[in-house]
């Protein structure tokens, strides 16, 4: 008799078999794939034994080349070789023009202002280019592990916004990968170090890669990784070090900065080689065309000092946001190839007062942490006592527009995700049957100073007096940091929703600027918000009084009384355009006082009309 093999939902019917899942570090300069094998997370090598895959894609008429060979062809075939595509993920064509010289490609605008790179195979989007890198890593993993993958955890900078995260997920799907989760790169590093060293306390993750910088302050307690605060710069990395050296060479050689793409590639390759050489040497020899020169480590450190200072400023801001003092930080983890620069390690050590941890290869630590998380999400059993919980946070507050152009925050920045928050709102005018929901991101009090994410309309609200309808708006951020918003009128049940997928992301430095502006303008913003609220309340009062005058003015007021009220209404209306909040408040009170008697008469009239023709017994019943 045959036996029916059964298993608990979500478990393998053969528990000794592990589901194959990987962690992928999709980097600006280099990418890696790692997996847990025999209980240890390790990067997976290609056929030549190399674990690092340069994030370079070269397009030929009939095929695509990815990795080291593509990178080497960048100087000879710059238009068909795409480097640092991560900088373009989720960006718009306007952002591309701002990057200018750093991107020697031929661009064309596509749908929703998405930039496309012109190649011999036609126009390619950043998502398609990234998909080629991910596809190469997927094939490497499947060949090494000997089977198909159930999914992958892909890391992204903590500062990636919704558009950039969605673009990453789209690239993964195009590459044939099931995304188990998008994981913030600093959090992935914490996973790797937390499991290896059983660390507890407050840890700073300093992540300086090729194109982005992230700083995260985490509290590690009993296997729980809680991100207290994040910060960074979406346009700061090792590529900027290369450009600093390239600019120095141009100045020293006395040549024009207006180089053709091939010469620009050659110059940047020479600059990158010099940067790497100065990690262990005191000076390096350089050449460009007929020029020969020497760059010392001291000169190099002077060139990059402003960039290092920018990263340290972000560190101090993240510490302030987390409420943690410098002396409370028990460890500093270095992540990213650019942290090999001696001056970077020295400056970070000086700031935190301790030697940074570099136990795990800074190029590999993120992929290793992602592999550990992927192994867990795939359902593979962990060893006893190795439970793992990750608590990421959102980098900027999320909210919506209210009357007066005000930003009402529903989810404050640094809130742990996944999260859902709801708040009730109401209508502003009598008979209002629709409401525009304007979703915003930012720290300022006025919508003009925040970033618009999306708009959608809730229709079918039953007509009723202003303030009677109750509309519940729910914001939900999933584990990948993607936002969905729903609005529902509680009485009728009508609802509308939207998943926020902006057509392109924030411009370079915009997130950092938004945070900095919020700190610098906090006092002014509160005053401006108070003024707007007073103006909205005053406008509502004016509309209510005018509606009452139109309905009952002739019947309940004599000419003199009506003239007094209308005069006070006009004075308040004249004040609305001013910035004198105190005067608006005083005049609103004055108008309320002069209409008290009118309001009482209207109430009496309404009660009399309701009781007319009815006896006492009917009323008591």
UniProtKB/Swiss-Prot annotation:
One of its GO terms (biological process) is iron-sulfur cluster assembly. The lineage of its organism: Bacteria, Pseudomonadati, Pseudomonadota, Gammaproteobacteria, Pseudomonadales. This is Chaperone protein HscA homolog. The keyword ATP-binding applies. One of its GO terms (molecular function) is ATP-dependent protein folding chaperone. Belongs to the heat shock protein 70 family. NCBIfam families: HscA, PRK05183.1. PANTHER family: HEAT SHOCK PROTEIN 70KDA. It comes from the Bacteria. InterPro entries: ATPase_NBD, Heat_shock_70_CS, HscA_NBD, HSP70_C_sf, HSP70_peptide-bd_sf, Hsp_70_fam, ISC_FeS_clus_asmbl_HscA. Transmembrane segments: none annotated. Chaperone involved in the maturation of iron-sulfur cluster-containing proteins. Has a low intrinsic ATPase activity which is markedly stimulated by HscB. Pfam families: HSP70 (PF00012). SUPFAM superfamilies: Actin-like ATPase domain, Heat shock protein 70kD (HSP70), C-terminal subdomain, Heat shock protein 70kD (HSP70), peptide-binding domain. It comes from Ectopseudomonas mendocina (strain ymp). Keywords: ATP-binding, Chaperone, Nucleotide-binding.
